[in-house]
């Protein structure tokens, strides 16, 4: 079975690599040290510090594994390879809900780079899926779990 690929920009991949390095070189050794200290307290059957450290170790190792998979199967997307006015990963898109005055600006990223607070939406999110491939002037219906709404794409530009 073919592995899933993770479309992302080069910047997103570099961010994941830094995060992985931090986990391996800083967090993992910290957790190992906490386990070592907790073991020194004696009886492990009633040692809450030991259990907490082991839980944290499992969490950190899970994060490491997830990041390694995303990096290994990263598919670097070159936004220059698509039309200048076409919505794609690595592009900034300005939209306006039909019948509303307010404009919204989103940066389309791979799932690894999503950050709603920074206006970065994943290509796998409802809004990302519904905008990918559309061009300036197009309308799109955004399907969300709570309903749908129509938007007009006002501007598409390469993300700086």
Curated annotation (Swiss-Prot):
Question: Which Cys residues form disulphide pairs?
Answer: none
| GO molecular-function terms, A-Z | DNA binding; RNA polymerase binding
Could you list this entry's UniProt keywords, alphabetically sorted.
Coiled coil, DNA-binding, Transcription, Transcription regulation
Q: Which residues form a coiled coil?
A: 1-72
Q: Name one GO biological process term.
A: DNA-templated transcription elongation
The reply on keyword Lipid biosynthesis is: no
The superkingdom of the source organism is Bacteria
Quote the Pfam families the UniProt record gives: GreA_GreB, GreA_GreB_N
In the record, the note on similarity to other proteins reads: Belongs to the GreA/GreB family.
Q: What is this protein called?
A: Transcription elongation factor GreA
Organism the protein comes from: Streptococcus pneumoniae (strain Hungary19A-6)
């Amino acid at each position: 079975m073919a592995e899933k690929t993770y479309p992302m920009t080069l910047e997103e991949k570099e961010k994941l690599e830094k995060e992985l390095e931090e986990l391996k070189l800083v967090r993992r050794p910290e957790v190992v040290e906490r386990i070592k200290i907790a073991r020194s307290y004696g009886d492990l059957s009633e040692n809450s510090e030991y259990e907490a450290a082991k839980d944290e170790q499992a969490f950190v190792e899970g994060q490491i594994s997830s990041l390694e998979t995303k990096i290994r199967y990263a598919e670097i997307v070159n936004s220059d390879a698509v039309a200048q006015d076409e919505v794609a990963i690595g592009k900034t898109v300005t939209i306006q809900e039909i019948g509303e005055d307010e404009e919204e600006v989103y940066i389309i990223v791979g799932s690894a780079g999503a950050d709603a607070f920074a206006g970065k939406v994943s290509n796998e999110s409802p809004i990302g899926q519904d905008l990918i491939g559309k061009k300036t002037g197009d309308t799109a219906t955004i399907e969300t779990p709570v309903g749908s709404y129509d938007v007009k794409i006002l501007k598409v530009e390469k993300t700086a």
